[in-house]
Amino acid sequence: MKDISDKRVNISLDNPSITFDKNKCDECSICKNICKFNVGVYGFSKDDYPCINCGSCTLACPNKCLSEKDETDKLEEYLHSNKVIVMQTAPAVRVSLGEEFGMKLGTNVEGKMITALRTIGADYVFDTTFGADLTVMEEASELVNRIKTSKKLPMFTSCCPSWVKFCEMFYPEYLDNLSTCKSPISMMGSVINNYFCKINNLKREDIISIVIVPCTSKKMEILRYNDIDLAITTRELAKYLKKEKINLAKLKNSSYNSLLGKGSSGGIIFGTSGGVMEATLREVYHILYKRYPKGRLLNFKSIRGTSNVKEAVVKINGTHIKVAIINGTGDARKVIEKIKNKEVYYDFIEVMTCEGGCISGGGQPRVFPLNKNLKNKRMNALYKSDKRMKIRCASMNPDIKDIYDNFFGEVGSDISLKYLHTKHRNEE
C-alpha cells in the first residue's frame, strides 16, 4: 500500500539516495516547502514519488526522519574484500568533513581525510579535481564550438545529477542543450576503469571503485554508468570513521596518489556555485586567446556567492558570452520559462540544485540552521585554495596534458567521446 501524504515529501522504498522513517515524522511540512519552492519538484509532477535525489530535504528535516541511504555496511564489506580499493574524493568534502569532528566551519581537512581513507583500507586515493579538469577541457571546447555554430544554445552545465534529472523530468525539450560531458566523478570512474587499470595490469573486476561525495544524488548517478561501485556521502564517511574510532582532527596529513594526478585549482572550485562556470571560462579564454587569463577570470566575483540567479557578460577575443549561474532548480524553472518566452537570452548557464553548490549538498553535515554564514565559510575555503595554487587552469595541468597525449589523443576525440561524454534521456 502506498504511503502518500500531502504534508511532506514522499519517498519511495526503492529510492537509491534517500530513506524515510515515518515514526520520526511530525508532518511539519518543512521538507515539502523546501522541495516545492527551492528545488521546484513537489507539486509539479503527477508521479506519486517525484524526486531528483538531491537530499535537500535531509538537511532541512529537524527530526532526521529523512536521511541519506546508509551504505556504510556495504563500505565495510568492500574494505574487507581482497580487491584493490580505489577511492576518489570530491572537492566540497574536504571543507566540510571536519565539522563532524568538532573542527571550525570551513576547515580544509584534505590531508587528514586522505590519511583517514588509507587508514580504513584504501589502496589508492585520487582527487576528483582531476576529473573536474577533464570536464573543463571537454566542456570549454564544446561551448566554443556551439557558440561558433550558434547551435544548441544556451548550453547548460551537466555536473549536477539532480539538475540533469530535473531537466529530463520537466524540460526534455532542452536535453540537447545540456552539455554532453559526464560529471567529474563519472569521468574519473571511467578513467580509473579504462586507463588506471590498464597501466597497472588490472581488470575492472580486480578493483572496487568508491567515491566520497557531498551529494546524495551521486548514489543515483553511479547507477547510470556502472563505472563506480559505491558513493559514500560526507555524513556516511564521518559515521564510519567514528565507528572505527578514528579521530580525524588528530591525524597527520598525507597526499593524494599521483598516478592520475592532481587537479588544477579550477577543479577545486567545482565544489561551489559558479565554480564550474569560472573554471570553464578560464579555459575558453585559453582556447580563444591562446594564452592564459589574468585578473577577472581568476577572481570572477560577480558570478560567485549564493544569490539565486547571477548574470555576467564576458568578452573574450571579440566574442561576447552572456552567462548565468542558478542556485536551485526552483529558480532554474523560472529562468527556463523566461528563455522559452524569449524574455532572456544566455549562451552558457550553470545550474546547481543546492544553494551554494556542492558545499551545501544533501550529504553534507547537518547544521541547523543551514545559513549563508556556514555556506560562505565552506565556499571561501575552496576559493582560498584556488587563490594560492599556481596551476589555476585545466590545460596548465601537466597531468592533464599527459593523459591526453597518452590516452585520449585530443579534446573531443573518439576516445574522449566514448569515455567522457554521455547522452541524456527523457524521463517523462
What does each model-found stretch correspond to?
Residues 68-428:
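Iron-sulfur-associated redox domains of electron-transfer enzymes in respiratory
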